[in-house]
Amino acid sequence: MHYPKVYDVIVIGGGHAGTEAALAAARMGRQTLLLTHNIETLGQMSCNPAIGGIGKSHLVREIDALGGAMALAADKGGIQFRILNSRKGAAVRATRAQADRVRYKAAIRETLENQANLDIFQQAADDLIVEGDTVKGVVTQMGIRFDAKTVVLTTGTFLGGVIHVGLEKSSGGRAGDPPSIALAQRLRELKLPVGRLKTGTPPRIDARSVDFSVMTPQPGDFPSPVMSFMGDVSMHPEQVNCYITHTNEKTHDIIRGGLDRSPMYTGVIEGVGPRYCPSIEDKIHRFSDKDSHQVFLEPEGLDTHELYPNGISTSLPFDVQFELVRSIRGMENAHILRPGYAIEYDYFNPQALKFTLETKAINGLYFAGQINGTTGYEEAGAQGLLAGLNAARRAWEQEEWTPKRDQAYMGVLVDDLITLGTKEPYRMFTSRAEYRLMLREDNADQRLTTIGRELGLVDDVRWAAYCEKMEAVERETSRLQHLWAAPNNPMGKKFVEMTGADLSKECSAIDLLKRPNINFSQIAELTGSEVSQQVGEQIEIAVKYEGYINRQHEDVAQLKRLEETKIPADFDYDVVSGLSREITQKLKTVRPETLAQASRIPGVTPAAVQLVMITIRKNNMTKKTA
């Protein structure tokens, strides 16, 4: 059957990348189709039941600032909230939400089903319709043809997915779901650069069989933080503890004894696993000097006894899993509800993409999520939103948009993937962002919501809330600039009495806030401020980090000069005099779009960038005089 409706955007896959892609395109007014093999799994958390964390919450806040769904779903489904790095600087603070899987998934599905311009259809996609070098649509498992101006692929771990438990293996996209075999074969036919990666998950445990009394409880923060700029604590369901226990030497001996049947250590698995989320067998092998490793027992939800033992991801045979679990303190009688497993899947070298996440080889075809070599819900959601908005803009022949490295962690993510590529699952960290003081999770809305409004991603309700917040920040900052404390006036005396600090000369309330040991809550008490905690936080960070932020703005200005120098798509690096063969090859492989991108390619020296710039300028001068 040839479906009668022509879509602007078709999104294949209903995971974290797919849902954000479909929602973004639909919010922008494009006729959008979301194809999923199973409507019941829309927004499913396939691995750990958590959103956010170091570097990751910055992405979640950016998705949220652009009108995305992930942060609000985390607020509606979060059963524990914590601020990580709370004693460190604002740039590296991160919010983490332990999520109830069912509530999170329900929140995502509710958002999808109530989104205008979005159709959902339950069918696996088996084929792409490609005419010449342009995608024209999709063919499903039943042979239904859907036509579209653009297609976004967000296939997660489903492309050629193989599940491993010990030396046994089976086809699967995740436990209980079939893989995408036909689509994987079709993509390989298109001559896109393909590789194999792997990820894993731990065995799930029945909480009724665990002795929590010998473990360390890990409560959430109080007052509880929120994930979304539109979130409120009243959205949160009941809050619960996680628990911490440890592996021991007996656990490690059991694991070592099972390595001869490990698919990782017998060469059965060829795909590379995530460096920063290693399996327990990998930890024992790589960190043999450690006599224990932490295990975090995380509730999967309020209405289930299922626990996620974060820290013991494994693909060892089930009998070894059984022994290693029961060797851990408090889990001596643990009942395993689901075995752990590893999954191996196809991904495509992201260097074959444009910065918009459109493939260079096929016009109108976009990739987002694990298909690009990333790991994590947050990384997937960020790519999905970018791919969806750019597919939407291309469908209406509008100029596409991608944030720069100094604008967003999304920009860092995309630039890293396309400039550097990846041979292992890529995870975001704050350390990857050179301008992280400007890219804090607290100011994601200031960086992106205005842009999101211009792109059509931000609705009236969010826009009004953002404008109200920024007006409050401006009003309160101005008020504090005009309130003065002097050694002998009432405000000055109250300040000294409250804080025990010295006050030798007249200072504005803003100047007092610049002091290292003074926080906004003290200034609020001193001056009778009634603004929200969120507004106060913005003012405090802006005041305390003003000098550092100004310095980063200067660095960005220098970078922009390189960003503004575009490298023509057909630029011939072979004619650049003085370039080494190695650097020439690297530049030809990556095909950087700007001098700034060229400067970030490993091994490309500042001198080489200078040579390319000189050649571009010479070429431009030649064209002008011709």
UniProtKB/Swiss-Prot annotation:
It holds the Pfam family GIDA_C_1st. GO terms for molecular function: flavin adenine dinucleotide binding. Signal peptide: none annotated. The keyword RNA-binding does not apply. PROSITE patterns: GIDA_1, GIDA_2. This is tRNA uridine 5-carboxymethylaminomethyl modification enzyme MnmG. One of its GO terms (cellular component) is cytosol. It comes from Acinetobacter baumannii (strain ATCC 17978 / DSM 105126 / CIP 53.77 / LMG 1025 / NCDC KC755 / 5377). Its cofactor is FAD. Disulfide bonds: none annotated. NAD(+) binds at residues 273-287. NAD-binding protein involved in the addition of a carboxymethylaminomethyl (cmnm) group at the wobble position (U34) of certain tRNAs, forming tRNA-cmnm(5)s(2)U34. It comes from the Bacteria.
